[in-house]
C-alpha cells in the first residue's frame, strides 16, 4: 500500500535542505519505494499564506499522512507577532495535534568527523547516544501560565511544570524498548531532589524498569548529566528525560558530534507515525546562500523510513550514502576542516544521490 508523506519546507534554510532530501526520496521512489508526497506550509511560510503558523490545510494533510518531513521553522522577522502566531508555535501545535509524545534524537559521531568535535577525539570517538525526550507535557505545555500584574503593580511571569503517571509510563516504554535494540542502558534524568514532578518520574521509571530486566536503569540529576555529557559522554546509551531538560541536553549532546547540522530527529506517536526533522534551527543568517548542511534532513528521512515506513534496508541505504560522502572528504562549511573539500548544499545533495 502506498505510504503518504507530508512535506513541510518551513523557514530559513528549510526549503534548501528539504529540496535536497526530496531528491533523495525521489530516487528511492524511482528504485521501488511505494510512497508519494505532498507539500504544505508550516511556521512563517504558513503565516504569510494563511495568517496562522499551523493552518487547517496543513493540519488536514498531516493528519492523513503516514509520516511528516519538516525542514525548520522560525525567523527573526516574525519576532514581533503575538506569541500564538509565531512560527515556533506551529511546531508546538503540530506535535500536540498529532500527539507526538516521544522525541528521539541520536547523537552519533562519525569517525570522519572526530576532529570536528570541540572535545578531544579520545573522549568522543565512537560516541552513540540516543536522547528520548517527552514532548507534549512538562513546563512547555503546563497550565496555568502567563504574565500577570501583582497587587503591588509589579509584573510576574509564571509557568506550571507537571507530568501525569500515564505520560511518564508511555515515554518510559519507548526509552526501554529503544535501549533493548542498543546497548541496553537507560539513564533517567531529572531533578528529583527539588522537583516533585521528577520525583514521580523516577518512581515510575523504577516500576516500568522491572518489565525490562535485560536493561540496566540508572538515574542522574540534570546538572550532573550536563556535566557528564562533556566529561565522559560514552558512559551513556539511552538518556530519558522530560521536555525542558531534554530540549537542553539534546542540544548539548549534538555539539559533542561537531555539528548540529549532522543530527536528525524523530517525534513519534503511539502507532509509529512521526514527524521527522533536523535537530538544528532555521539558520536565517545563511538562508538562500546554498551553504546549509542538508545531511541532518537526509538522515531524518532515513529515520522516517525506519520508524514510520518500517523499511530498515532503505534507511540503512541512506545512512550508508551519507557516510560514503563523508569518507570522500566532502564537507559543508559547518563541518569543514583543512584537507577536506568545501561543498555547497546542492553539491552535497548531488554527492549523496551519487552515493545512493
Curated annotation (Swiss-Prot):
It catalyses: (2R,3S)-3-isopropylmalate + NAD(+) = 4-methyl-2-oxopentanoate + CO2 + NADH. GO terms for biological process: L-leucine biosynthetic process. Its cofactor is Mg(2+); Mn(2+). Keywords: Amino-acid biosynthesis, Branched-chain amino acid biosynthesis, Cytoplasm, Leucine biosynthesis, Magnesium, Manganese, Metal-binding, NAD, Oxidoreductase. Its main location: cytoplasm. Homodimer. Belongs to the isocitrate and isopropylmalate dehydrogenases family. LeuB type 1 subfamily. PANTHER family: 3-ISOPROPYLMALATE DEHYDROGENASE. This is 3-isopropylmalate dehydrogenase. It comes from Neisseria meningitidis serogroup B (strain ATCC BAA-335 / MC58).
Amino acid at each position: 500500500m502506498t505510504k503518504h508523506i507530508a512535506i513541510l519546507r518551513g523557514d530559513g534554510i528549510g526549503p534548501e535542505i528539504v529540496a535536497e532530501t526530496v531528491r533523495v526520496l525521489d530516487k528511492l521512489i524511482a528504485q521501488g519505494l511505494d510512497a508519494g508526497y505532498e507539500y504544505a506550509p508550516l511556521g512563517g511560510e504558513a503565516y504569510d499564506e494563511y495568517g496562522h503558523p499551523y493552518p487547517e490545510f496543513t493540519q488536514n494533510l498531516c493528519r492523513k499522512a503516514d509520516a511528516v518531513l519538516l525542514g525548520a521553522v522560525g525567523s527573526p522577522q516574525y519576532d514581533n507577532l503575538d506569541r500564538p502566531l509565531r512560527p515556533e508555535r506551529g511546531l508546538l501545535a503540530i506535535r500536540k495535534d498529532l500527539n507526538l509524545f516521544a522525541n528521539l534524537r541520536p547523537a552519533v559521531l562519525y569517525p570522519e568527523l572526530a576532529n570536528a568535535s570541540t572535545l578531544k577525539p579520545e573522549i568522543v570517538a565512537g560516541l552513540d547516544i540516543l536522547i528520548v525526550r517527552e514532548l507534549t507535557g512538562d513546563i512547555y505545555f503546563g497550565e496555568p501560565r502567563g504574565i500577570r500584574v501583582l497587587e503591588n503593580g509589579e509584573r510576574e511571569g509564571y509557568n506550571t511544570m507537571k507530568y501525569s503517571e500515564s505520560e511518564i509510563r508511555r515515554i518510559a516504554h519507548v526509552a526501554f524498548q529503544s535501549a533493548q535494540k542498543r546497548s541496553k542502558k537507560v539513564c533517567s534524568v531529572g531533578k528529583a531532589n527539588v522537583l516533585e514532578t521528577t520525583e514521580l518520574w523516577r518512581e515510575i521509571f523504577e516500576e516500568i524498569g522491572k518489565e525490562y530486566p535485560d536493561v540496566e536503569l540508572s538515574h542522574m540529576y540534570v546538572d550532573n548529566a550536563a556535566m557528564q555529557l562533556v566529561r565522559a559522554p560514552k558512559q551513556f546509551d539511552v538518556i530519558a528525560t522530560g521536555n525542558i531538560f531534554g530540549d537542553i541536553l539534546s542540544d548539548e549532546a549534538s555539539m559533542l558530534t561537531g555539528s548540529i547540522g549532522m543530527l536528525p530527529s524523530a517525534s513519534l506517536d503511539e502507532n509509529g507515525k512521526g514527524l521527522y526533522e533536523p535537530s538544528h534551527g532555521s539558520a536565517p543568517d545563511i538562508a538562500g546562500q546554498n551553504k546549509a548542511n542538508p545531511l541532518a534532513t537526509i538522515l531524518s528521512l532515513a529515520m522516517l523510513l525506519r520508524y514510520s515506513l518500517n523499511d530498515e534496508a532503505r534507511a540503512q541505504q541512506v545512512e550508508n550514502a551519507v557516510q560514503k560522502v563523508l569518507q570522500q572528504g566532502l564537507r559543508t562549511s559547518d563541518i569543514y576542516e583543512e584537507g577536506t573539500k568545501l561543498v555547497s548544499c546542492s553539491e552535497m545533495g548531488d554527492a549523496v544521490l551519487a552515493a545512493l
